[in-house]
């Protein structure tokens, strides 16, 4: 029991700064929406539409770079710190190449927005302008993620937390300047949010890079100042490890986007209730997501130390903590669902719909916790292909089709509207949780030599 308590303390010490960093990042999006909404409803809608395109594109790159965390953790645990700088340099090369692709996608997003039916021309123009401003922040965001993954792989999660809140503090005045036109700048409205956010991402990268250059704990793994050509073999390994995670993130983000589109013809009450429940459950998701990041670090570090048994302890301790926290957040959601809905809206019908959907959201928080921490465990074991297949099957083969049948058709039951899709979420996430646990157990039953050899690749 003592080894589990000791591991729990170390996991929480890593996870709490990650939770706060995620809160800071989520708050930036909230601030953008509120400050754009103060100009006009059109500006707020333009930011919302632009963000719905930005997120899948940038999270694909983010997922690709998550491969760096277990690589650094394993090298650090095995005492091969001299190899870390080379891996980080290749991750910067990878981030630069992915940035170009993301920028091309965002620059041409106008074709996607234009293909949507009945979109107000002014909204379309502002959304495209927002994306064209924001795309210049893509390299800064991805370079920041490389520096963050480097720190987290070394069990240093506080720098990203501090820099995240610094970014939030910088974002507010920059929004004010570019949205309303101060200090000689033109008033750009919602487009100004894109300019401000892109600038903030570069500020965050510069600050965290400066910190890593000066940190005493990282002096032995400083990046060489001279130019070095990309190591395509190392980049290929990082891509092979990160691509399944990137695709899994893409599947998840696009799933919720597709459901939002499918719910949209069901009327304002249904759409608003669905959006409120989804927004609140996304806030609750920050806790298990951060635990998943901490679990990747601990499992990778233990495997680097050559202890498959201690990696197993880290994995199951994280699942235990996650289930306990999910029970707390689920009970909180059930107890205060109506009051929470009232924070978002004052329409009684919308509040009732949101409160009903939050009951379903409370149910899926348990499965969501198990599956996202399971994904963190598998990343630590460098078994990322399994994450891709599990996510695809759970979300797109099971969750979405069942949700559509229950929500929009009478084939199984009378059409349930948004509730049907939420039942689909529960089925998909529960399936994912079961498959993640099955995969964890299968990996842990393999000979220690096999597990350690995979981790050392």
Swiss-Prot record:
Signal peptide: none annotated. The keyword Cell membrane applies. It is a multi-pass membrane protein. Its main location: membrane. One of its GO terms (biological process) is response to antibiotic. Keywords: Antibiotic resistance, Antiport, Cell inner membrane, Cell membrane, Ion transport, Membrane, Sodium, Sodium transport, Transmembrane, Transmembrane helix, Transport. The keyword Transcription regulation does not apply. GO terms for cellular component: plasma membrane. It comes from the Bacteria. Multidrug efflux pump that functions probably as a Na(+)/drug antiporter. Confers resistance to the hydrophobic cationic compounds norfloxacin, ethidium bromide and berberine. It provides protection against antibiotics produced by epiphytic bacteria, such as P.agglomerans, which cocolonize plant blossoms. Belongs to the multi antimicrobial extrusion (MATE) (TC 2.A.66.1) family. MdtK subfamily. This is Multidrug resistance protein MdtK.
